[in-house]
């Protein structure tokens, strides 16, 4: 150690530059080597090549330094090696290229590829240990593979990242670096060391508060699974709820969530206790169903062996199962009956006769529907043409249509006549109002003319003018009326106006 220190101290002054260059090369190799270790990244080959170049440069610098220490007499030993003389410009990347490659690295790809490799190789265990044990027991007993039969449920469990690996998952904002500095007018060239450390500390605080990528992926998988179970997509899949239940785990993990989702009641008719909540009753009465007894399953019909079944009840049941049809439906039935056989017509006639017998025996009022459904139309019940032959029924319906058309035309004519009468009455009233308005205008013009004549006559009247007085009398009269409101000349003229009103004054003596 002492020899080395003496040798280094005895080295020429230019060895300081060599020490600085070697230190820079070692620092660059130490900084770049952690980033290029995962070769599974997108540009892993380029980063590996860059690391190899830097390592060779570092080894060469160390060897050159040893050579300089061993032989200090050579005049060329003090020259600093130039990288441009040893490498071509394409082999040694610049700092900007290194930074660009570092920024282009996807931080998620290495983790995702590693997780996919673990899932493919089978070394990665999902969160549900009880589910895996149950599946292994099922496969050991000769059961089928779970992934092929129920791909919609267990695939989500395999894709989900376990809780133990969540802390190693990168944050969702980890790939956002210092690009936000441009918004404040500063660029990456103008940033100082203090600014960079401040931005890094702020980014670290944000990344610590932000959720991680694994949390986001697990939440998306849970939402997808819940949506599939909500739309009843996975109810036809095999039910592994008994296998997925883990008695040791008390926390609601993914397997328990899927188990609760698969326990949703459905109408598939499976013999599970939970399926009786939404399953409709098996016995559907004809009151709620528009179909007859012939279209219902055999289990819903009563057998003659039942104790509560007798001939009268049978007739009532048959009568209730006959639906109600209006005239339009009967016209459609006529067309279908034209192509049917005579046996069907006889059967329908027998059913109608049985229905009439039942209505007579029960004592229902006339016009009330017998099938249990409320009557349509004008309160009448079942159509009376149901018991007729097709030709007779057609003629009856045509006669009804003709009578209805006549009544409609008559009612329409009456409404039209009533409307025309109202129009004529309104026209007469309008003419009367116009005549009254014209008379009112004539009277107004006559009043204005008479008022103008009266005003003109009053202005020409001389009865209010008195006898002319002498100068002394006029002066004395003016002196007496000086303190009054009006002068004597105004009073003599007879046109004195008090508050805008024309008043006739008495004659002066």
Swiss-Prot record:
Region spans: Basic motif: 393-413
Residue ranges, compositional bias (Polar residues): 283-303
Keyword check for Transcription: yes
Subcellular location: Nucleus; Chromosome
SMART domains from the UniProt entry: BRLZ
One MF term in the entry's GO annotations: DNA-binding transcription factor activity, RNA polymerase II-specific
InterPro entries: bZIP (IPR004827), bZIP_sf (IPR046347), bZIP_transcription_factors (IPR051027)
Main location: nucleus
Segments of this protein annotated with the region Disordered: 283-318, 337-400
GO biological process: antibacterial innate immune response; cellular response to metal ion; cellular response to reactive oxygen species; defense response to Gram-negative bacterium; negative regulation of innate immune response; negative regulation of transcription by RNA polymerase II; positive regulation of innate immune response; positive regulation of transcription by RNA polymerase II
Pfam families xref list: bZIP_2
Ranges of compositional bias, category Low complexity: 337-364
Record keyword DNA-binding present: no
All copies of domain bZIP, residue ranges: 391-464
Alphabetical keyword list: Chromosome, Nucleus, Transcription, Transcription regulation
Family: Belongs to the bZIP family.
Name of the protein this chain belongs to: Transcription factor atf-7
């Amino acid at each position: 150690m002492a020899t080395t220190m003496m040798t280094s101290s005895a080295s020429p002054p230019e060895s300081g530059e060599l020490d600085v260059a070697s230190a820079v090369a070692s620092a660059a190799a130490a900084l770049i080597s952690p980033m290029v270790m995962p070769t599974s990244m997108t540009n892993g080959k380029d980063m590996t090549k860059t690391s190899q170049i830097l390592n060779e440069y570092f080894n060469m610098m160390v060897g050159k330094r040893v050579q300089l220490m061993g032989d200090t007499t050579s005049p060329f030993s003090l020259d600093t090696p130039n990288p441009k003389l040893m490498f071509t410009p394409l082999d040694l990347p610049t700092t900007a290229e290194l930074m660009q490659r570092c920024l282009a690295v996807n931080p998620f790809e290495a983790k995702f590829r590693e997780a996919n490799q673990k899932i493919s190789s089978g070394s990665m265990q999902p969160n549900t240990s009880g589910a895996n044990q149950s599946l292994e027991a099922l496969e050991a007993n000769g059961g089928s593979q779970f992934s092929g039969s129920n791909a919609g449920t267990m695939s989500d469990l395999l894709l989900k990242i376990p809780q133990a690996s969540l802390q190693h998952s990168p944050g969702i904002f980890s790939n956002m670096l210092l690009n936000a500095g441009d918004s404040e007018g500063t660029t990456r060239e103008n940033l100082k060391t203090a600014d960079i450390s401040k931005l890094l500390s702020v980014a670290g605080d944000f990344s610590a508060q932000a959720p991680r990528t694994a949390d986001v992926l697990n939440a998306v998988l849970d939402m997808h699974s819940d949506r599939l179970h909500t739309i009843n997509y996975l109810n036809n899949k095999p039910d592994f709820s008994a296998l997925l239940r883990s008695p040791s785990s008390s926390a609601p993990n993914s397997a328990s969530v899927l188990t609760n989702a698969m326990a949703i009641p459905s109408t598939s008719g499976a013999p599970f206790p939970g399926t009786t909540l939404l399953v409709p009753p098996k016995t559907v009465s004809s009151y709620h169903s528009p179909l007859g007894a012939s279209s219902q399953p055999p289990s819903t019909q009563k057998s003659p062996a039942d104790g509560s079944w007798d001939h009268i009840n049978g007739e009532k049941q048959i009568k209730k199962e006959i639906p109600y049809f209006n005239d339009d439906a009967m016209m459609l039935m006529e067309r279908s009956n034209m192509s049917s056989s005579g046996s069907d017509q006889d059967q329908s006639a027998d059913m109608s006769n049985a229905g009439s017998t039942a209505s007579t025996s029960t004592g229902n009022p006339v016009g009330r529907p017998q099938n249990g459904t409320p009557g349509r139309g004008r309160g009448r019940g079942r159509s009376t043409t149901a018991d007729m032959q097709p030709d007779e029924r057609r003629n009856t319906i045509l006669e009804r249509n003709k009578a209805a058309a006549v009544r409609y035309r008559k009612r329409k004519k009456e409404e039209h006549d009533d409307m025309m009468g109202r129009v004529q009455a309104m026209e007469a009233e309008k003419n009367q109002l116009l005549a009254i308005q014209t008379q009112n205008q004539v009277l107004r013009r006559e009043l204005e003319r008479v008022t103008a004549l009266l005003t003109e006559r009053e202005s020409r009247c001389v009865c209010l003018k008195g006898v002319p007085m002498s100068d002394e009398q006029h002066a004395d009269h003016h002196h007496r009326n000086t303190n009054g409101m009006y002068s004597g000349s105004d009073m003599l003229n007879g046109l004195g106006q008090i508050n805008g009103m024309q008043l006739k004054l008495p004659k002066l003596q």
